[in-house]
């Protein structure tokens, strides 16, 4: 893939703001920007410069230019970043003039793509930048920063090197069958080495899938009888009146959705119809949906109050919650005495007390964060991948290694093993971008922001 033109895009949101940043990158970056400068033309050198921009002798703006000379820039190309006065009209006008002067409007993620293609960052770092920008919670932010910096990427390099070592040992035994006493080349040795790599890949996949789910959002159903405060819980969590809150039983007949981003996890919240005995056909459809959502949800927030906790309808819900991850929420806790709370804590597991109408849900938020505080995905020195394409590649690597292990343990000819090991090694190269297809790379970077 060869990209040799010069591109421009806003690096900040185009809106009514004090300052906007416009990025120009490519071999002709200085030449194009100089077309807008009358006096003190830019030289190809690094620095900060104050200049006035003109178009057809009309003063457009007074700006600060941050200049970088290839290869010492983010993209590896000549780069001029224009800090101009903000505003939709002003920012767009400068961009349009730069396009008329020879630049092309950059595609989404094209600056990061150029950085990757010019060897400034690998593919894991590139995806880390995107993860950082789109992080919904502290966990995703932490993973994005770690992957962007490349601090944990050596794990993939080590896996590649170790796998190549096994491939080489097998190849030696194939090419020189008489030398069967080469150290570390016995079937037992190769199996042990391969199992170590397989275990590392399995752990990477486990961490990554868990972190991906926490980052994208856990499907969370808020269930309970009518008028116990389910909608108040939803509104308190997302800090907006998305669900109708009244004293009339059966107000929420359908599904209401919202999202909340906590420290360790994001929740995709679903407020469901209250579960009760009713002859109302429409309400019964909502109740059936509520019961089905219990099976589909990753986490259930089961809301009760002190008056109805032992009702038969709630006992039915407790039965549905067997083998499910759930939190029992006793709402309207302001009506409970300290002794009543202690007695309930002794009787029920994973219980919290809230007063959602007063927005007192601290216990609930703390409990959810604790539940999803996983040591495996909170280690600072472990590689975690949360891009869907990355996780798919790791799954493919896992499958190739599993097949290779099955072959070597079955006693089949050793040369057959190398086919799957070579495939796994090539997939590791694809993971960090040593090998890639142009269409796949385009697809990855088009998911990025314009200007990045």
From Swiss-Prot:
Binds 1 potassium ion per subunit. PANTHER family: TRNA MODIFICATION GTPASE GTPBP3 (PTHR42714), TRNA MODIFICATION GTPASE GTPBP3, MITOCHONDRIAL (PTHR42714:SF2). Its EC number is 3.6.-.-. The keyword Metal-binding applies. (6S)-5-formyl-5,6,7,8-tetrahydrofolate binds at residues 23, 81, 120, 452. One of its GO terms (cellular component) is cytosol. CDD domains: trmE, TrmE_N. It comes from Mycoplasma mycoides subsp. mycoides SC (strain CCUG 32753 / NCTC 10114 / PG1). It is found in: Cytoplasm. Its cofactor is K(+). GTP binds at residues 227-232, 246-252, 271-274. This is tRNA modification GTPase MnmE. Mg(2+) binds at residues 231, 252.
């Amino acid at each position: 893939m060869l990209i040799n033109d010069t591109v421009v895009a806003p690096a900040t949101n185009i809106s009514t703001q004090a300052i906007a940043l416009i990025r120009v990158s490519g071999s002709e970056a200085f030449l194009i920007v100089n077309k807008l400068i009358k006096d003190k033309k830019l030289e190809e050198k690094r620095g900060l410069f104050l200049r006035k921009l003109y178009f057809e002798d009309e003063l457009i703006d007074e700006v600060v230019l941050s200049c970088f000379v290839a290869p010492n820039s983010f993209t590896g190309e000549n780069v001029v970043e224009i800090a101009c006065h903000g505003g939709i009209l002003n920012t767009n006008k400068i961009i349009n003039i730069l396009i008329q002067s020879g630049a092309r409007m950059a595609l989404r993620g094209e600056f990061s793509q150029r950085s990757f293609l010019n060897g400034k960052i690998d593919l894991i770092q590139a995806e880390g930048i995107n993860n950082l920008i789109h992080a919904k919670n502290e966990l995703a932010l932490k993973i994005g920063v770690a992957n962007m910096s490349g601090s944990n990427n050596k794990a993939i390099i080590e896996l590649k090197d170790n796998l190549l070592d096994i491939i080489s040992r097998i190849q030696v035994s194939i090419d020189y069958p008489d030398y069967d006493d080469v150290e570390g080349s016995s079937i037992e040795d190769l199996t042990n080495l391969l199992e170590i790599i397989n275990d590392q890949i399995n752990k990477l996949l486990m961490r990554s899938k868990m972190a991906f789910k926490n980052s994208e959002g856990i499907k969370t159903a808020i269930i309970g009888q009518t008028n116990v405060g389910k909608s108040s819980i939803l509104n308190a969590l997302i800090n907006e009146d998305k669900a109708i809150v009244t004293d009339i039983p059966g107000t929420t007949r359908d599904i209401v959705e919202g999202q909340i981003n906590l420290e360790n996890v994001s929740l995709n919240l679903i407020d469901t119809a209250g579960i009760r005995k009713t002859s109302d056909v429409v309400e019964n459809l909502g109740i059936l949906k509520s019961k089905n959502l219990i099976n589909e949800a990753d986490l259930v927030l089961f809301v009760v109050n002190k008056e109805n906790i032992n009702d038969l309808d709630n006992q039915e819900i407790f039965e549905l919650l067997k083998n499910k991850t759930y939190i029992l929420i006793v709402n309207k806790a302001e009506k409970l005495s300290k002794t009543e709370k202690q007695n309930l804590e002794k009787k029920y597991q994973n219980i919290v007390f809230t007063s959602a109408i007063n927005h007192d849900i601290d216990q609930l938020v703390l409990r959810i964060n604790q539940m999803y505080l996983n040591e495996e995905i909170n280690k600072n020195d472990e590689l975690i991948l949360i891009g869907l394409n990355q996780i798919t590649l790791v799954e493919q690597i896992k499958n190739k290694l599993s097949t290779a292990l099955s072959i070597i343990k079955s006693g089949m000819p050793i040369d057959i093993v190398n086919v799957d090991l070579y495939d796994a090694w090539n997939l590791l190269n694809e993971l960090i971008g040593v090998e890639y297809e142009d269409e796949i790379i385009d697809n990855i970077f088009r998911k990025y922001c314009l200007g990045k």
